[in-house]
């Protein structure tokens, strides 16, 4: 459970940073990022969701570390994280 909390925290942090940097309110970006983070590879993040950003070597090392945390999650836990974030983002739409 500790790894999934860390993964969620880092994902939310990256989302906030990217959101502030672009000045966009882009929930789709975050969902794409999270989906790729949970079921894809770091390379897929760099080529897709983060493709327009300059990802430095330290950030790439952090993504590799996240991948090792993610690999330890059971598939049902990954799915539940996605469901939770969809719920949170959906509640923001209604606010």
UniProtKB/Swiss-Prot annotation:
Cellular-component GO terms for this entry: extracellular region
Q: Main subcellular localization, coarse class? A: secreted
Leader sequence residues: 1-23
Which CDD domains does the protein's record reference?
Secretoglobin
| Alphabetical list of Gene3D superfamilies matching this protein | Secretoglobin (1.10.210.10)
Which keywords does this chain's UniProt record carry? Secreted, Signal
Task: Show the Pfam families listed in the entry.
Answer: Uteroglobin
Q: Which InterPro entries does the UniProt entry name for this protein?
A: Secretoglobin, Secretoglobin_1C-like, Secretoglobin_sf
Q: What is this protein called?
A: Secretoglobin family 1C member 2
Q: What gene is behind this protein? A: SCGB1C2
């Amino acid at each position: 459970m500790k790894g999934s909390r860390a993964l969620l925290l880092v994902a939310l942090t990256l989302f906030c940073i990217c959101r502030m940097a672009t000045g966009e309110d882009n929930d789709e970006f975050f969902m794409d990022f999270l989906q790729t983070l949970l079921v894809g590879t770091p390379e897929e993040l760099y080529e897709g969701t983060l493709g327009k950003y300059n990802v430095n070597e330290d950030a790439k090392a952090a993504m590799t570390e996240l991948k090792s945390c993610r690999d330890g999650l059971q598939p049902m836990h990954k799915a539940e994280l996605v469901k939770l974030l969809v719920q949170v983002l959906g509640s923001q739409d209604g606010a």
